Amino acid sequence: GGCQQNGSATIVDVKVGDKVSNWNGLGVQLTSLFNIDTAPAQAGYEYIAVLVTVVNRTKNQTFNIGAQNLAEINAAYPVPPQENVDANFHALAAASTDFSASCDGQSVECGANISLYNSNSQTFSDSTNLPPQGTGYLQLMLMVPKGWKQLSVTYMPTFAADKTMTFVMTAADVTRA
């Protein structure tokens, strides 16, 4: 990858499998990306999901990440049914202002939320934030043109001004079911 100076302004080129142990209190590993079975209404596009393992290494700082109105989006456009996937996605993407994505040079929509891990119940639940010492997944959902080659997602955290982290993926990275 590129420059991986922890704590500096920018980390570029975090690729699948890459791990960043502590970046402004956040640990990440770009875990996987895969196709989502549901096809978007927009012809010539497909949905893909990107999972990033995340851990909050701070003792007392909560990190708000992704859409902050998750409950409202899921109440307005519950999934299932499948008919609500597009509306849910567009609302999620519009609310995920701390993420931007581009695919083969063109801007694409990207929705983001946290899936928190509860070690007591050994379950995951959707969340708007990552609490101190919390772990889970950052779930990114993107709508990309079919036949895409390269995808980059830039994260601009609300808790660390003027710092960005960019995840870079290629179509070859997609996990085939």
Regions found by a protein language model. Name each.
Residues 4-5:
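Bacterial signal peptide processing site
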Residues 11-45:
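Low-complexity, acidic Ser/Thr/Pro/Gly-rich terminal tails and inter-domain linkers that flank the onset
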Residues 24-29, 44-52, 97, 136-138, ...:
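Envelope-exposed proteins and targeting segments
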Residues 32-34, 54, 58, 66-69, ...:
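A mature extracytoplasmic/lumenal domain signature
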Residues 33-49, 61-64, 129-131:
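Short, solvent-exposed beta-strand/turn "edge" segments of beta-rich domains on protein surfaces
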Residues 55-132, 176:
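The feature marks short-to-medium sequence segments in extracytoplasmic or secretory-pathway proteins
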Residues 102-104, 122-177:
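Surface-exposed edge beta-strand/loop patches
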